[in-house]
Regions:
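Adenylate-forming
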Residues: 25, 40-44, 58-64, 78-82, ...
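Residue register of alpha-helical TPR repeats
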Residues: 13-17, 24, 55, 62
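Solenoid-repeat scaffolds in large eukaryotic assemblies
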Residues: 35, 42, 53, 72-73
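Amphipathic alpha-helical segments of tetratricopeptide repeats
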Residues: 1-8, 40-48, 79-88, 122-123
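Residue signature of alpha-solenoid helical repeat architecture, marking inter-repeat boundaries
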Residues: 10-13, 50-51, 92-93
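C-terminal non-catalytic interaction modules
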Residues: 69-150
Length: 150
C-alpha cells in the first residue's frame, strides 16, 4: 500500500481488487482487524471498479453480521441489490450469497428495523454506504478491542 500511494496508483482497479480479495481472505480466516484494513485500502477502487461492487457490499455485510451490526448489514445488502438493479453486474455466486444473507438478517431483525435499514440502503449512493460501513466497522472493532490503532 505505501508503494501504491507513493507512485499514485492507489486508485488502480487491479490493485484495489487485490486489496478487496485480501480483505475477503482475512475475513474468512476470522481476522476482522486485517479484513477491515484491507477493505479500507480497497475503497479508492469503488468509483472505477463497478464489477466488484457486489464483493464489497456482500463482504462487508458478512463482516457487519459477524460484529452484530445487523442494521448495517441490511443497509449494505439493500445498497448492493440496488446497485445490481442499476448495473446488472452481480455474478450468480454473489446473488446466492446475497439472498442467503438477506434471509439471515431479515430473520434476526424485527420487520420494522429491517424495513427501515433496507429503505436507507436503497436511497443512498452505493459508494457512500460502503464508506460509512467501513468507518462504522472500524469503530466497532476498535471499541471491542479487536482493531489495533494505526
Amino acid at each position: 500500500l505505501p508503494l501504491a500511494k507513493r507512485f499514485g496508483n492507489d486508485r488502480d482497479p487491479n490493485l484495489c481488487g487485490c486489496f478487496l480479495y485480501l480483505a475477503t481472505l482475512a475475513q474468512k480466516k476470522g481476522d476482522y482487524d486485517a479484513a477491515i484494513r484491507w477493505y479500507r485500502a480497497s475503497l479508492p477502487g469503488i468509483p472505477v471498479d463497478r464489477d466488484e461492487w457486489s464483493s464489497w457490499g456482500i463482504g462487508l455485510a458478512g463482516l457487519a453480521m459477524a460484529q452484530d451490526r445487523l442494521d448495517l448489514a441490511a443497509r449494505l445488502l439493500s445498497a448492493t441489490e440496488a446497485a445490481d438493479i442499476e448495473t446488472n453486474r452481480m455474478w450468480p455466486i454473489y446473488q446466492n450469497d446475497c439472498a442467503r444473507l438477506v434471509s439471515e438478517v431479515q430473520s434476526k431483525l424485527s420487520a420494522e428495523r429491517f424495513d427501515a435499514a433496507w429503505a436507507e440502503g436503497r436511497v443512498a449512493p452505493f459508494e457512500q454506504v460502503v464508506e460509512e460501513a467501513v468507518s462504522i466497522l472500524e469503530a466497532t472493532l476498535a471499541v471491542r478491542g479487536q482493531l489495533a490503532p494505526t
